[in-house]
Structure formats: structure tokens, C-alpha cells
Swiss-Prot record:
Keywords associated with the record: Acetylation, Coiled coil, Cytoplasm, Cytoskeleton, Isopeptide bond, Phosphoprotein, Ubl conjugation
Lineage, highest ranks first: Eukaryota, Metazoa, Chordata, Craniata, Vertebrata
Stretches of the chain forming a coiled coil according to its record: 152-172
Cross-link annotation Glycyl lysine isopeptide (Lys-Gly) (interchain with G-Cter in SUMO2), location: K222
Modified residues (Phosphoserine): S203
Positions bearing N-acetylalanine: A2
Name of the protein in question: Dynactin subunit 4
Free-text function comment from the UniProt entry: Part of the dynactin complex that activates the molecular motor dynein for ultra-processive transport along microtubules.
Amino acid sequence: MASLLQSERVLYLVQGEKKVRAPLSQLYFCRYCSELRSLECVSHEVDSHYCPSCLENMPSAEAKLKKNRCANCFDCPGCMHTLSTRATSISTQLPDDPAKTTMKKAYYLACGFCRWTSRDVGMADKSVASGGWQEPENPHAQRMNKLIEYYQQLAQKEKVERDRKKLARRRNYMPLAFSQHTIHVVDKYSLGTRLQRPRAGASISTLAGLSLREGEDQKEVKIEPAQAVAEVEPLPEDYYTRPVNLTEVTTLQQRLLQPDLQPVSASQLYPRHKHLLIKRSLRCRKCEHNLSKPEFNPTSIKFKIQLVAVNYIPEVRIMSIPNLRYMKESQVLLTLTNPVENLTHVTLLECEEGDPDNINSTAKVVVPPKELILAGKDAAAEYDELAEPQDFQDDPDIVAFRKANKVGIFIKVTPQREEGDVTVCFKMKHDFKNLAAPIRPMEESDQGTEVIWLTQHVELSFGPLLP
């Protein structure tokens, strides 16, 4: 019975750009293409950025400017948990009468797990609860910014050169109306990438970014090349002999979390701004319809669109596995679950000889020859013990039990290899009412809903053989 909860034992094949085998719970179903989709054959789109601590939502441009970090929340540099702001009272001298003191609130950062505080590294307390915390400066920040600016300018130059070469190759195919004077103006103002057909109502602001090629070029950024140092500063004489206090030495993970500073001792650990998380949408690459789209609000866990495969495709699970032995036929009990509200007809088929998808099978399988009918999903009937079951005239040699939208069936497995895990493959053919089909005017012969037949390749892993 434990195998009933092990969904990773049952894999479905996704026929996309790359064949992927995954549990049904990790797949999506495109109602427009009527095909399974995995995370490797969908387009990922970022909908919003938000902080997991304060749940502040920000646009992509602002998140990029802040380096995808929250300005108000911090992570503990010791244990990586979220830091909290704590208040304390300190005595301060009055500016009018230094002999008198008054109590004033002060705020500092503290970790509730490892007891790290901002006072451990000498950070001054703040008079306000949010913002204004001192951050260590990277000694190489100026050099890095210079390099980034230089390579951005270099990339822009290379892009302009590529556009000019493309324009030069297209000159032989330009119409007669494209005169030499026009080409000269295009080259002079670098309009190679802006040759677009004028649209009605187009704004003249598109020309605001143009500049002359000569005399108005941006100031060229020059950098000093890095120079190798002949003499390296030697290590201290007591480097190998002095005792090491492990509580004051940072771990490898703590150093990698601060690559700009590379702290060696615990006294150099400074809090880091918390990383932002994203809400993303998934889109089918074939038809470009959304498969998953979450709510924009960070506090909401609901989805506007969530086409997970377990809500549309019959799910196969292993209920009981007998003792499997080499070249001995055994009977395995499977369960089929209908996730939709209407009746579903399912037919199990054995893989044909030379099937390119049947590459992992190590055993021979005999599936029920008859068509199976799965009752529609009804949440109320599942818990109603007094409900009268429908009469499907099941064959007891094939169907072990039936309850609500679930049915238990027998298959026969004969291992063909003396060692290794036992894996069987078969095809599952089932009908599906495509609710996403275009609506047409109903006629006498039209049922109103398009019914299509889908075939899924299913792989079952039964574990190792017994001696």
C-alpha cells in the first residue's frame, strides 16, 4: 500500500522538443494543443518581484535597480535566517544640560536563531526602525563599475557594426526609391536598425534617441589593464602556529554569500539584503496560451490559470506489488482515477514491437483487453457510504474494486531480466472533452462539446527482483 503514495514510480512521457518522463503531478496539460507539457517545454515569464519577508511588490525595473534585493529586510550572515528589528532604551545626554540624561529608543538587528546582532560587528544603533543601516563598502566597487561601463559600451559598438554589415548586404536588393542620398543619411545617423515602415499616428519621439555619427559620439570609456604583481605579500610568521578558534572563523557558505567582501572572521560578517522572489507564468511554446498564471498580489496563493495535468488526465498508481521473480508471471494491482466530472473511457494497450518510446521496459506486461469506464469525479459521493454504486458490469478478473471515480484493475507482469529493477510500459488511450474548443452554433448532430481521444505513454517501476 505504501506504493500508492509514491507517485514517482509512475512516469508519463511528454512528447515535446525533448522527451521528458515525469510524474503526472509535475506536468501541465495544454487544452488547446491537447498535449502534456513539462517545465522544459514551456516558456517562463516573470510576472512580479516581491520580498518574501515584508511582501513588498515592485516592478521589474525597480528590482533590477536594487539588484533584486529588498531595501528594508536583511538576512542573518551567520545562519541565513531573516533578521528582526529590536528596540531598546538607551540613556542620552540632553543638548541643553549635559548633566541630565534622558531615555531614548534605539533599534538594532538581531537573529532569533543564532543570536547574532548588528552590535557584534560594531554597527551603530538607529533611531528609526526601518532603513539607514550602515553597509560595508566594497574596495573594488569603483573598478567594477568602470569595467561594467566599458563592456556595455563595447557591446553597443559591436551591435552597431553588425547592423551596418546587415544593411550593406541588403543594399543590392533595395528598391529604386531607396536612393543613394537616402542610404547616405541612413549611414550618417546610424539608422540601420530603425528602417521600419512608417505607421499611422507614429510618435516623432522615436527619433529622440538618434545622434550623429561624427562629432556627437559618446565619450569613450578607457580602462587601465590589470597588471600582474611580481611580489606577493608573505603570510604572517605565526600563520601556521597560532591556535585557531573555530567559532571566530567563517564557514565556506558564509564566505560565498558575500563574494565582494570574503569575510575571514565572524567579526567581519555584515547583514545582507534579502533576495527577492518572483511570481512567474508558464506559457505553451506551441500555441502560446497560458498554462499557469498566478495572482499578482504577493499575499495570494491562488492562480488565475492553473492547467495541471492531474486535473485532466486519468492518473495511474500502483496499489500493491507482489514478489517479482525472473520469468514468473505475477499479478499487480493498479488504480485509475478520473479527475474530470464526466465519464471517461480508458483502454490500456501494450507497446508494439520497435516502439521508440519503449526503451526502459524490462518485463512483459499483459493489460486488460476490455475498455474501462471511470465514473465522474463527485466530491460528495466519495464520502457518502449510502450512495448507490453505478452498475458498470465489471469483470471480476479485471476489476478488483470500484469506488466513486476510482477503479482498481489487475495487470500481469513477467520479468525478462535476471537482475535490476522491474519496469513495464504501456499505452493508455482515453477520451477527453475539449472545453477549450471554439464554440460553434449547435446543430442536431452536434453534441456541443468536442470529444477527442488521447494516448499517453506510461512507465511503471516495481522495484528490484527477489532472488
